[in-house]
Amino acid sequence: MARGAGLVFFVGVWVVSCLAAAPRTSWKRVTSGEDVVLLPAPAERTRAHKLLWAAEPLDACGPLRPSWVALWPPRRVLETVVDAACMRAPEPLAIAYSPPFPAGDEGLYSELAWRDRVAVVNESLVIYGALETDSGLYTLSVVGLSDEARQVASVVLVVEPAPVPTPTPDDYDEEDDAGVTNARRSAFPPQPPPRRPPVAPPTHPRVIPEVSHVRGVTVHMETLEAILFAPGETFGTNVSIHAIAHDDGPYAMDVVWMRFDVPSSCADMRIYEACLYHPQLPECLSPADAPCAVSSWAYRLAVRSYAGCSRTTPPPRCFAEARMEPVPGLAWLASTVNLEFQHASPQHAGLYLCVVYVDDHIHAWGHMTISTAAQYRNAVVEQHLPQRQPEPVEPTRPHVRAPHPAPSARGPLRLGAVLGAALLLAALGLSAWACMTCWRRRSWRAVKSRASATGPTYIRVADSELYADWSSDSEGERDGSLWQDPPERPDSPSTNGSGFEILSPTAPSVYPHSEGRKSRRPLTTFGSGSPGRRHSQASYPSVLW
């Protein structure tokens, strides 16, 4: 059912106090079948007036769970929120006149009731034999002769079913001699359950159950469940945390604040306690009522960490460090674990969780709804896991044969992509091969040209005079000279040479300006570094071209 913000009915003193300036709303719980006395007339009132009792039934809204709400300036009241869709229109129940109102035939009447089992007794509303359908909001209004009607009191009546009596052994007969068992009911008529005295509301906020250990740390936390504010107010939370160590071991404590948005479509927010301890469960990650469920969280709004704590140095006396997300108008309240809202706006409204970790384990937690009156929603704590959101299933038509799947258009595209990739790789391979071939050719040419440029250069045509100094008339000597090293010359240069031969002309050269040059210069070899390998060119008879 879609629920809007305008379909939410608020029950509590904050509605009456802020909107109608009336006294607080009270709560009354009775058992089915009891006689209930509600809303006595106020003691201080004008003489001429009439009293009007009315009711707004809430029996179709399920169980009502009131919560303690703090108003600013500090004040605590019980309140709850119900969906207007489950409510029926207000109904007048009874009216009383003071002095009595004149009726026809010169008669007077002072009370008038429009419903069975309802009467006015001593200017109080009485419901005889209350039923579960009588649960609702009851109001009393006073109307003066010259004033408009004003509401002076209201009460939320919750009628619970009567407990079923359990049978006792006295209600049955023992087995007789024939083995026949005759059960008989008690002859006494059932007695109505004893009337319970009214229970006053607690004077302190609800205490979150703490974690107790024989060893380790016990944490106590106290907090209000809701704070209502008007836009522009500055206020702070009121969380009290006490850590008691049972041994001398050191420990670390983290106080973590988390915030959750409260959608206007939710009549209440459900906090699944099991998900606080196991937030990674599938039911907690995907609850069926995700918008209105608190089962997992993405980030921490504020963290105050205490390190090096012990029995003798409990928080906040141990080393503390605080971190907070940058939220305008939100800050730490001094050096405590509480938050301060400065010039609060509707954007600050939401459901806040305060969780205490001791050595990375949850030891205590509490929740708090901080909002304006128009944004307020109930916060209900559930002990069980939420229902998991069902997986989406594609709808199928029954008794209809599914058509053959059409050929996918992605097939040709994939084939074209594969062929294109193959052609591209082939082109890259050919290009690489061509580049390598060209590079190798250029390298070979460069080496060849370098070798030809550094080779020996001959400046004379070989003739018979070139070998005159080493020629011999004996054929045998000429033949043997091929296998012997030439003798060392006195004018030989140093053994460190380049290995090339310098040919000097010993006869008239074939080039100009060489006539008359009769000096015979020996052919000198600049040795390669080893005297044994140094030799002259004449040692090897050959023809130089």
From Swiss-Prot:
Residues 465-490 are annotated as: Interaction with VP22 and UL11. Gene3D superfamilies: Immunoglobulins. A motif (Internalization motif) lies at residues 458-461, 467-470. It is found in: Virion membrane; Host cell membrane; Host cell junction; Host Golgi apparatus membrane. The keyword Transcription regulation does not apply. Its main location: virion. The chain crosses the membrane at residues 415-435. Disulfide bonds join C266-C292, C275-C284, C309-C318. Residues 162-206, 386-408, 470-545 are annotated as: Disordered. Residues 179-188 have a biased composition (Low complexity). Glycans are attached at N122, N238. InterPro entries: Herpes_gE_N, Herpes_glycopE_Fc, Ig-like_dom_sf, Ig-like_fold. Residues 21-414 are virion surface. Residues 1-20 form the signal peptide. It comes from the Viruses. Residues 189-204 have a biased composition (Pro residues). Belongs to the alphaherpesvirinae glycoprotein E family. Interacts with gI; this interaction enhances the Fc receptor function of gE. The heterodimer gE/gI interacts with the Fc part of host IgG. Interacts (via C-terminus) with VP22 tegument protein; this interaction is necessary for the recruitment of VP22 to the Golgi and its packaging into virions. Interacts (via C-terminus) with UL11 tegument protein. This is Envelope glycoprotein E. It comes from Human herpesvirus 2 (strain HG52). The lineage of its organism: Viruses, Duplodnaviria, Heunggongvirae, Peploviricota, Herviviricetes. The gene is gE.
